[in-house]
């Protein structure tokens, strides 16, 4: 995939990372792939810079809504990461659980462990950009989603069967990508996007050429004009190479 990104950039095409991950973690991917400096991060709630190692734009959720949402997931006992700018707020229990599979530098350098995230953000008036909630129990996810959706000022979505993501209703990857395009001197009418899950829908809807990964959900495939190979088959590289060929 890094080779395809390099070929695209050499031919004058901008390639940016658009992800649900926080700035530090997204930066790891951007450096590995060799993409442009600007990134859409935190599911569209933030724009970030690889070189500056920080958010350049934030759309945070209302303070009270963020505290209430954190309290809900803490009460149910679900592991959660709360994104506040460049910092990931987690509890000691979250740290143990996420630590089982997260060891990348971006995660380790971003995390801040506090006894209660809900209490911490309420006491310190922390602006929250996103919450990432994970569970292997589908019943718990349904229960949490039902409770979270009753809180005004937030939007609940998912990027996989085992998670929930919470952001402000004003933010999505499509809006953020539009802002990023303007920074690059272009617009969404000249943009393509590649996605596979619910949190990609707004971005795919916003661009001129929406491309579904081969492993994408049915909702994503139905929305897209084109389908590429799966993640396992380097579908992103295949999609980029086809765009290079068409613009050659």
Positions of PLM-derived features:
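Active-site phosphate-binding/coordination module
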Residues: 2-102
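Residue-level signal for inorganic ion chemistry
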Residues: 8, 19, 43, 131, ...
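Short active-site oxyanion
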Residues: 12-16, 36-37, 130, 189-191, ...
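Conserved acidic, metal-coordinating active-site core of Asp-based
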Residues: 72, 76-79, 83-194, 198, ...
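Mg2+-dependent phosphoryl-transfer enzymes with acidic/Ser/Thr/Gly-rich catalytic loops
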Residues: 164-248
